[in-house]
Amino acid sequence: MDSNADISARRVSGMDWLWLVCFFHLVTSLEEILLDTTGETSEIGWTSHPPDGWEEVSVRDDKERQIRTFQVCNMDEPGQNNWLRTHFIERRGAHRVHVRLHFSVRDCASMRTVASTCKETFTLYYHQSDVDIASQELPEWHEGPWTKVDTIAADESFSQVDRTGKVVRMNVKVRSFGPLTKHGFYLAFQDSGACMSLVAVQVFFYKCPAVVKGFASFPETFAGGERTSLVESLGTCVANAEEASTTGSSGVRLHCNGEGEWMVATGRCSCKAGYQSVDNEQACQACPIGSFKASVGDDPCLLCPAHSHAPLPLPGSIECVCQSHYYRSASDNSDAPCTGIPSAPRDLSYEIVGSNVLLTWRLPKDLGGRKDVFFNVICKECPTRSAGTCVRCGDNVQFEPRQVGLTESRVQVSNLLARVQYTFEIQAVNLVTELSSEAPQYATINVSTSQSVPSAIPMMHQVSRATSSITLSWPQPDQPNGVILDYQLRYFDKAEDEDNSFTLTSETNMATILNLSPGKIYVFQVRARTAVGYGPYSGKMYFQTLMAGEHSEMAQDRLPLIVGSALGGLAFLVIAAIAILAIIFKSKRRETPYTDRLQQYISTRGLGVKYYIDPSTYEDPNEAIREFAKEIDVSFIKIEEVIGSGEFGEVCFGRLKHPGKREYTVAIKTLKSGYTDEQRREFLSEASIMGQFEHPNVIHLEGVVTKSRPVMIVTEFMENGSLDSFLRQKEGQFSVLQLVGMLRGIAAGMRYLSDMNYVHRDLAARNILVNSNLVCKVSDFGLSRFLEDDASNPTYTGALGCKIPIRWTAPEAVQYRKFTSSSDVWSYGIVMWEVMSYGERPYWDMSNQDVINAIDQDYRLPPPPDCPTVLHLLMLDCWQKDRVQRPKFEQIVSALDKMIRKPSALKATGTGSSRPSQPLLSNSPPDFPSLSNAHEWLDAIKMGRYKENFDQAGLITFDVISRMTLEDLQRIGITLVGHQKKILNSIQLMKVHLNQLEPVEV
C-alpha cells in the first residue's frame, strides 16, 4: 500500500507544472463523487458494532444547519474496539478511490481521569466485494477481512464540548487506496478509545477532463489505479488537421496521471495544407481568399507573394499560381514570389585592341525580380557587302572568362579576324528564362576590327637534320590577317638560358638553321610578319641534331610537305580565292536542316593544312614523342595525391611550375614500374596523339617526362572529372540549355578531330572530361586510329580481335570492324542520350548480344525523361543504319547552335514527329520467356481488351504474331493509333526475343 499525504501537502512536481503551464495549460482534474454525507439531514443508517459504540446523531454546523454525524466517546473502559461500516459503494469504473474525512477529536489531556485509555486517532479500512454481502456479522468485525488504509490523527483537538452543540475544531484529511478490481467496496472506521465526531465522509475518484489541445480531441479518461499510474488516451485530430509526421510516433496520445491531470504528450496534430490555427490550437480554419498555406504544419496562412494569385476564388488554397509571364524556378520555394525574365543589358560598349574586343555593359534595368542574372554572348560574323548573311562565329573565337553563363558584366573576345564586321548580342537570362515562351532580351552592337598582326603558327615540322644543321617547315598562320611578308625564327640550346637565343628571317615557310652543335637539343619558335607587324611566337618545339658520325637524314615521307612549303605563298592566294568562291556558292544553295545559314567550316585540304599523323608510322616511336610532345623537367612537377588508376599505372593530381611562370594544376599519368618496351610505346603513343591537337574542347597535353622514372604524361587538370559520373552526381541540377551547351562543346571537339581526319573509336561520356567552368573536352585516345584521306571510302579497319564498346559503337563497326567519322557520329548520339539522362547506362541492363539484336531490328533508344523532341530526333539521325545518312559533326554543331539561339525549340518533349518514327526500346519490356500465349502477352502490355480480336483472327502463337504489320492490326479491328503503335512496338521486341533463340552470327 502506498503512503498517503495530506491534501495540503499535495503539490504538482516541478516538471509536471512546467509542462502544464508551458505546453498544454490544461484545465484542472475532475472529481467523480461516489459517496457524500456532507450536509446530510436524514438518517444515514450505517452499521456500528458493538451497538453501544458509534452512534448517529444530529448536530448544527457553523451555519446553524442541522446535519447528521457519527460520534463515539467510550474512553472510560480500556480495550475499546468500536466499528462503523458504510453501505456498499459501487466503484463505477474507478481504479483508485479517494476519501475526504471531516472530523473532530477531543484532547485527551482535558480528560485526566481517563487519560491512560484515551486515544486521539482512529483507523480507516476498506473491503472489496462484487455484491452487497453486508449483515450484522459480515464482513466480520475484526481486521482480518479488511484492508487498512491508514491511521488517522487529528491536527487539532478541542478540550470541551460546545454547549450549543456546534462542531468545533474541524479536521479535514484525504486518504486514497487502490487499485480496485471488484464491483464495489465498504469503508470501515475503527475507534480504539477516542472521543470524536465523524462529521462528513466524501468518497470520490479523479478523472482527466475531455480536452482539445494541439489540434487533437481527447475524451474524458479515468485516473489509474496507482498514484504514479499514467493511463494512455488516444486523441483524434480535429477537423482539417492531420497527424504530424514525427519520427517514432504512432498516433496522438496524452496520459492521465493518478491525480486526474493530463501530462506526457506524444505525437501531435497539425493543420492541413490550406488551413491555419485558430482559438489557441483548438481548431483549423481555411486560409482566407488571397492567402495560402503550402504544407501541413502550425504556420499561419500567408498572403500570395508578388505576381501570384490563388488558383480559385475560394478559401483553403494550398498554393498561389504565377500570373502570366511570371514564373518560379525549380529551386524556388512554393512561397517565393513569381519572377520574370530580365530586360536587356544596358549601355553595351566595346573597346578594340588589335583583333581583340572588350565588351562591357551594365545590369538590366529590370532584373525580373531575381538576383540570379547571367549573360550569354552571341557572336556573328557579318560580311560588309552582303547584308543579312551574318553567320555564327567559328570555334576559334575565344571568350574570356566564358561565353555562356557570365556573372560579370564584361567579356574579352579574342582570335577575331582582322577587317571584319562583327555583331555581338549580349543576352540577359535568369533561372526562369527557360520557362518563358519569350526569347531572352538582349543588347546588340556592331564592331569592325582593324587590320591586325598574324595569329600564332600552330606547329613546326622537321624536314631534315645533320650534325650541325636542321631544316624546318611550318604551315601558314590560321589567321594571316594580311599578306605574310616574312617569318622570324628564334632558337636556342635547350641547356642554356632563353636569353641567349638567335633569330633567323625567312621569306618562305621553310628554313635551314646552320652552325649548330652535334647531338644537341634546340628549342625553336617561329612567328609571321605582315605590314602591321609581327604576330606572336608559336609554342616551343624541340628538335635534336645528329650525333657526330651519324649520317644526315631526310624525312622522305614528308616530301609533299617540303614541296608544299616551297609553294606555300602562291598556294595561299589560290586557296583564299577558292574559299571565297566556295562561300558565295554555298550561300546560294538550299538550306539543309542542320546549317541554318551558319558559317560552314572551310577546310582547304591543301598545303599548310594541319593533319593528324599516326605515331605508329614512325620507324622510331621516340621521334614521334620528340616531335609532338614537349619534354618537361621532372623538377618542375609536384605530385600531390593519387586520384585514380589506369591500364598502365596511376593517375595523379599535381602542380606544374615552369621557371619564371605561375604554377598551375595538372593531371599526371604515370607508367608503373616493371614495364616492357611495348608497354612504354603504347603508353607514350597517347601523348604523341594528344600533342597534335589544340582545341578548347579537346584535352590539352602539357608535355611528357621520359628522361626520368616514372615516365609521365602531363595534361591539363579537369576539376569535375568524367562526364558520366559528374552528371550522376548532379542529377537534375542543370537546365536543358546548359546540357545542350555541354553537347555543343563535345560536338565542336569532335568536328575538329574529324577535320583532322581522326577517328576516335571510343567516344563515350566516360571519356569526356569536365572542368570547373562546365567546359567538356574529348579525351582518352587509346583506341583511336588514323583515318586515311580517301574521300570515297574513308575507313579504318580494326584488328579482328580488338575489344569494342558495343553500346556506343555503330553497327557497321561492330559487324565489320570498320571505323569512320560516321561511326563516331553514332557514338556521339549515344553520348547525347547519356547527357540527357544524367549518366544512365545506355540500353540499361540488356546484354551486349541483346543490344546487337535490337539495333539490327531497327530498335533505337527512347528519349530520356523530359528530353526535348528536337534533341531526340537529332539522336535518331545519328543512329541511322546507313552511315551515309548520318549528319556530319559540322552539321551537328550547327543544329545545336540553332537550339541555343532559339531555346523555345527545346520546350517540346515526347516522341511525336511528322516523319515516320522508328521503334523505340522500353526500359521494362514484357518478360517473353515467362509468357506462354497471346493472352498473357496482351495482358502484359495492358492490351487485354483485344484478346477476342486475336482469337477470331487465329493469331495464337508468337511466331505468327511477330510477323504482323500495321495493316494486319487494322484488319482485325484495332483502329486506335496509340494502341496500334504500342502493340507494334511490343511485336518488334517479340522479334528480338525470337531471334535470340536462334544462333546469331556477329
UniProtKB/Swiss-Prot annotation:
<feature type="domain" description="Eph LBD">
    <location>
        <begin position="31"/>
        <end position="213"/>
    </location>
</feature>
<keyword id="KW-0418">Kinase</keyword>
<dbReference type="InterPro" id="IPR020635">
    <property type="entry name" value="Tyr_kinase_cat_dom"/>
</dbReference>
<dbReference type="GO" id="GO:0005886">
    <property type="term" value="C:plasma membrane"/>
</dbReference>
<dbReference type="GO" id="GO:0005524">
    <property type="term" value="F:ATP binding"/>
</dbReference>
<keyword id="KW-0067">ATP-binding</keyword>
<keyword id="KW-0472">Membrane</keyword>
<dbReference type="InterPro" id="IPR001245">
    <property type="entry name" value="Ser-Thr/Tyr_kinase_cat_dom"/>
</dbReference>
<dbReference type="InterPro" id="IPR027936">
    <property type="entry name" value="Eph_TM"/>
</dbReference>
<comment type="function">
    <text>Receptor for members of the ephrin-B family.</text>
</comment>
<keyword id="KW-1133">Transmembrane helix</keyword>
<feature type="active site" description="Proton acceptor">
    <location>
        <position position="762"/>
    </location>
</feature>
<comment type="similarity">
    <text>Belongs to the protein kinase superfamily. Tyr protein kinase family. Ephrin receptor subfamily.</text>
</comment>
<feature type="domain" description="Protein kinase">
    <location>
        <begin position="637"/>
        <end position="900"/>
    </location>
</feature>
<dbReference type="InterPro" id="IPR009030">
    <property type="entry name" value="Growth_fac_rcpt_cys_sf"/>
</dbReference>
<feature type="topological domain" description="Cytoplasmic">
    <location>
        <begin position="586"/>
        <end position="1002"/>
    </location>
</feature>
<keyword id="KW-0547">Nucleotide-binding</keyword>
<dbReference type="InterPro" id="IPR003961">
    <property type="entry name" value="FN3_dom"/>
</dbReference>
<feature type="domain" description="Fibronectin type-III 1">
    <location>
        <begin position="344"/>
        <end position="452"/>
    </location>
</feature>
<dbReference type="InterPro" id="IPR050449">
    <property type="entry name" value="Ephrin_rcpt_TKs"/>
</dbReference>
<dbReference type="Pfam" id="PF01404">
    <property type="entry name" value="Ephrin_lbd"/>
</dbReference>
<dbReference type="GO" id="GO:0030425">
    <property type="term" value="C:dendrite"/>
</dbReference>
<dbReference type="Pfam" id="PF00041">
    <property type="entry name" value="fn3"/>
</dbReference>
<dbReference type="GO" id="GO:0048013">
    <property type="term" value="P:ephrin receptor signaling pathway"/>
</dbReference>
<dbReference type="Pfam" id="PF07714">
    <property type="entry name" value="PK_Tyr_Ser-Thr"/>
</dbReference>
<keyword id="KW-0808">Transferase</keyword>
<keyword id="KW-0812">Transmembrane</keyword>
<dbReference type="InterPro" id="IPR017441">
    <property type="entry name" value="Protein_kinase_ATP_BS"/>
</dbReference>
<dbReference type="InterPro" id="IPR013783">
    <property type="entry name" value="Ig-like_fold"/>
</dbReference>
<feature type="topological domain" description="Extracellular">
    <location>
        <begin position="30"/>
        <end position="564"/>
    </location>
</feature>
<dbReference type="InterPro" id="IPR013761">
    <property type="entry name" value="SAM/pointed_sf"/>
</dbReference>
<dbReference type="InterPro" id="IPR016257">
    <property type="entry name" value="Tyr_kinase_ephrin_rcpt"/>
</dbReference>
<feature type="signal peptide">
    <location>
        <begin position="1"/>
        <end position="29"/>
    </location>
</feature>
<feature type="binding site">
    <location>
        <position position="669"/>
    </location>
    <ligand>
        <name>ATP</name>
    </ligand>
</feature>
<dbReference type="InterPro" id="IPR000719">
    <property type="entry name" value="Prot_kinase_dom"/>
</dbReference>
<feature type="glycosylation site" description="N-linked (GlcNAc...) asparagine">
    <location>
        <position position="446"/>
    </location>
</feature>
<dbReference type="Pfam" id="PF14575">
    <property type="entry name" value="EphA2_TM"/>
</dbReference>
<protein>
    <recommendedName>
        <fullName>Ephrin type-B receptor 5</fullName>
        <ecNumber>2.7.10.1</ecNumber>
    </recommendedName>
</protein>
<dbReference type="InterPro" id="IPR001660">
    <property type="entry name" value="SAM"/>
</dbReference>
<keyword id="KW-0325">Glycoprotein</keyword>
<dbReference type="InterPro" id="IPR036116">
    <property type="entry name" value="FN3_sf"/>
</dbReference>
<feature type="short sequence motif" description="PDZ-binding">
    <location>
        <begin position="1000"/>
        <end position="1002"/>
    </location>
</feature>
